[in-house]
Curated annotation (Swiss-Prot):
Lineage per the UniProt record: Bacteria, Pseudomonadati, Thermodesulfobacteriota, Desulfobacteria, Desulfobacterales
The protein's name: 3-isopropylmalate dehydratase large subunit
Catalytic activity: (2R,3S)-3-isopropylmalate = (2S)-2-isopropylmalate
Cofactor binding: number and manner: Binds 1 [4Fe-4S] cluster per subunit.
An annotated Gene Ontology molecular function: 4 iron, 4 sulfur cluster binding
Annotated NCBIfam families: hacA_fam, IPMI_arch, PRK00402.1
Similarity remark: Belongs to the aconitase/IPM isomerase family. LeuC type 2 subfamily.
Length: 431
């Protein structure tokens, strides 16, 4: 029986005899942020195990609430900051250099095809876009990873999602993953890898693939994963060119990371996305998804464009094209958070920030804040936000608030209209 790409990565990193389905694997990266890691740090210190297995393989960032909004968040940042200094972790990103982790770390070249990565964050699955196995873990596993550079994980079973066809104008990776989650359900991929393949994925940018993999967890997936290809090589080339004599050589090496034709899958889901229309969530689960047309006219109070799902430069370009020459509706607050300083700088240079500001958007520093209702865009009870984030749980962006998830194009169109609407109304700008 053949192996899936995830199983091949596991096999290459196995460091011990498996115990049933549990394998201990060697880690290429342990990523950290200020919300979950301080608990692990303090626990290790209490156990007199304040050590790290390899400072070069640990990356850390203060991103969820930055700058700190109160004494509690300041204390969390202080713990992470002092720990990074204490152990010589050069890959630490503090205020001025920091950005949303799942956009920042790939942008810095820290994720490679075939890598194994853990982090105390459920959207760690984002890194699978590069052909890596990446999983969010709890505090105990994070502690072991920091201390020993290994993690015990179930041998991966996989759901294969084949995306055929070509995206229509005004339809984006966010619409695709919402449609996939609606099909699988919020528990449909629990403890499984979601492998994204097919012509649609092949045609996607790395940013779009990261959007797909980022939301694998919303169907219960441990990890989302794509096959590395020439698009992956192009994205990473500045970081890997010293390791390969040519791009073709890198591509040849990466092409080995594919599933075998006779690999065993728990399920194969084929979707033709050629006729897919823009999607938006309703209710309080990510699998509550409808065509935007069925939610047309739903009033909104706020639009948020950003996050580890849709805060990259490609996303800001899409939104800015819709907004150019338009104004935010008087009843709507528009907020945009570029995901990293590099994204922010590029958006400035391209005139995107000027477009957002001219339209009436507030532009924030790179941060996760609003996505999880911690800062920079928290909702009041009864308010509604059309958001490019990844979760619409009850109270996610503020107690009593409602979140509708959508693409940057749909979010931008909603900001103009004051309600959920299709960006086809601004089609020439959105294409």
């Amino acid at each position: 029986m053949g192996k899936t790409i995830a199983q091949k990565i596991f096999d290459a990193h196995s460091v011990d005899q498996p115990f049933g389905e549990v394998h201990v694997i060697r880690l290429d990266g342990v990523f950290c942020h200020e919300i979950t890691t301080p608990t692990a740090i303090c626990d290790l210190m209490e156990k007199n195990k304040d050590r790290v297995f390899d400072p070069s393989k640990i990356k850390a960032v203060i991103d969820h609430v930055t700058p700190a909004k109160d004494s509690k968040t300041a204390a969390q940042g202080k713990i992470l900051r002092q720990w990074a200094r204490r152990h010589g972790i050069d890959g630490f990103f503090d205020i001025g250099r920091n950005g949303v982790c799942h956009a920042l770390f790939p942008e810095q070249g820290f994720v490679r095809p075939g890598h194994t990565i853990i982090m105390g964050d459920s959207h760690t699955c984002t890194y699978g876009a590069f052909g890596a196995f990446a999983a969010g873990v709890g505090t105990t596993d994070l502690e072991v990873g920091i201390l020993k550079g290994v993690c015990a994980l179930n041998y991966p079973s996989t759901i294969k999602v084949v995306l055929n066809g070509k995206l229509s104008p005004g339809v984006y990776a966010k619409d695709v993953i919402l449609a996939v989650i609606a099909e699988l359900g919020v528990n449909g991929a629990t403890n499984r890898v979601i492998e994204f393949t097919g012509p649609c994925v092949d045609a996607m940018s790395m940013e779009a693939r990261m959007t797909l993999c980022n939301m694998a967890i919303e169907a219960g997936g441990t990890c989302g994963i794509c096959y590395p290809d020439k698009t992956t090589v192009a994205y990473l080339w500045e970081f890997i060119k010293g390791e390969y004599p040519s791009r073709q050589a890198a591509l040849k090496a990466f092409k080995k990371l594919v599933s075998d034709p006779d690999a065993d899958y728990d399920r194969v889901l084929e979707m033709d996305i050629s006729d897919l229309s823009p999607r938006v969530t309703y209710g309080y689960k990510p699998d509550c998804v409808k065509p935007v047309a069925e939610m047309e006219g739903t009033p909104i109070d706020q639009v948020y464009i950003g996050s580890c799902t849709n805060g990259r430069l490609e996303d800001l370009r899409v939104a800015a094209k819709v907004l150019k020459g338009k104004k935010v509706h008087p009843s709507v607050r528009g907020i945009v958070s570029p995901a990293t300083p590099t994204v922010f700088q590029a958006a400035l240079e391209e005139g995107l920030i000027a477009t957002f500001m001219a339209a009436g958007f507030c532009v924030t520093n790179p941060t996760c804040g609003a996505c999880l209702g911690m800062s920079n865009g928290v909702l009041a009870p009864g308010e509604v936000c059309l958001s490019t984030t990844n979760r619409n749980f009850n109270g996610r962006m503020g107690k009593g608030g409602m979140v509708h998830l959508a693409s940057p194009a749909t979010a931008a169109a909603g900001a103009i209209a004051g309600c959920i609407t299709n960006s086809k109304l601004y089609k020439k700008r959105a294409e």
